[in-house]
């Protein structure tokens, strides 16, 4: 059997205090994750109630539309007809580098506050400075653009902001950024709208057609959506925006706590940092 050496404090009391410190950090991270899940679930429930089931509007008249039967007076538009920016980024020919500006790829678009820092890749600062597209400014809708097995495409979405996952980062060529002229509230509305069964099925079908599974700009811009000037859409955005802001702040705090935990552990175990009673 091989011999391994571990730096473990001999004092049992010190071991317990170290475990207590690390456990408190883990508990706070878990609490933030639960809060974020609850906040998104709350927003999702309101969205479904208003824009899928139309519960608050069932006593009124409904009319036919490109989205099916909807409350009378509601406007529907194609994304192509709503002022927006839909773009992707790119990477240099040589690929990623070890240090520089973070480059966000499809593997990072996994829902809200689910960025995997262990998979972060970078582009050099000089290349980033020349890019005319793909910079993440905050609260744009990130769309998983392409990738996966032939004939099989599962779309996913995310919204970054408030310095999460980074203060400065760019997209690569496998992610779309959709922004309705800086309308954060409508971008958030679109996040939930794209997650509805109807739109997910549409993306599934469109993405599976290509040799390399994925969607293009036309696929996105052809989508019909409730117009941003609908009163109910505006009210939902005003409700959901503070929730998303808090979720992003919690995610940033979790990143700080994770780094603190990972930095403290070896220093506590080695005795470099003394554990006070």
Feature locations, PLM:
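Glycine- and charge-enriched low-complexity intrinsically disordered segments
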Residues: 180-198
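Non-catalytic DNA-recognition/assembly elements of restriction-modification systems
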Residues: 7-53, 57-90, 222, 226, ...
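Short coil/turn segments at secondary-structure boundaries
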Residues: 57-61, 92-99, 118-119, 204-207
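Sequence-specific dsDNA recognition surfaces
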Residues: 80-95, 107-144, 148-151
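A short glycine-rich beta-alpha junction/loop motif
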Residues: 1-16, 166-176, 203-234
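Short, ligand-facing micro-motifs at secondary-structure edges
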Residues: 110-121, 144-171, 188-192, 201-206
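Short, glycine-/Ser/Thr-/acidic-enriched flexible segments
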Residues: 84, 109-111, 148-150, 164, ...
